[in-house]
Amino acid sequence: MFSERGYDGATFQEIAVRADLTRPAINHYFSSKKLLYCDVVDQTNELVVANGIQNAKRALRLMDRLSEFIAVVMRASSEDPSVSPFLVTAVLESQRHPELSRNENDAVAISRVFLNWAVNDAIERGELKADTDVPSLAETLLIVLVGVGFYAGYLGNYQEMRAVIETLRRLLEGAFWERGA
């Protein structure tokens, strides 16, 4: 419901109907919409962002790490199509409603830390040039991941996403550039 209507548009009544519960049942566990919303954000971040980072850290190369992270998002979205739209919506809502943003479980902040680590690690292993501007590259990769999340959530389907992710991977690895052109 939050991914469809946003924080302001979602009501307890609509959430209860969608969850096949009564409004009092939801109010028993969550005394406010803010508490419910923050719990959904926490669970979604754990399911997608934390698991994506955990899987990505097992890979050895930067592109493999990004691919693993994206694969977790794709799997979660194929199992529950509201996941990607909700993650995108949560980022927007945290800008509209700063009181909903909590740094310890902010998907953008957590992803940014991971990407800075991954870029630094790629430099240390000689995969990237030593003079790489880490914050700029990490932020660029964050933009790519947010774009992929937006596309997965609102525009593409699972099959399209697999092809797009493979093309993105090849693009970032330089597979499309003509040598000497």
Feature map (PLM): residue ranges:
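Short coil/turn segments at alpha/beta junctions that flank glycine-rich nucleotide-binding fingerprints
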Residues: 4-8, 58-59, 80, 125
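Alpha-helical structural segments
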Residues: 4, 18, 35-58, 64-75, ...
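Amphipathic alpha-helical segments used for helix-helix packing
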Residues: 64-65, 78-102
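C-terminal peripheral helix-coil segments that are non-catalytic and often amphipathic
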Residues: 68-75, 112-124, 139-144, 155-181
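Membrane-interface starts of transmembrane alpha-helices
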Residues: 80, 130, 134-138
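Helix-turn-helix
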Residues: 1-35, 39
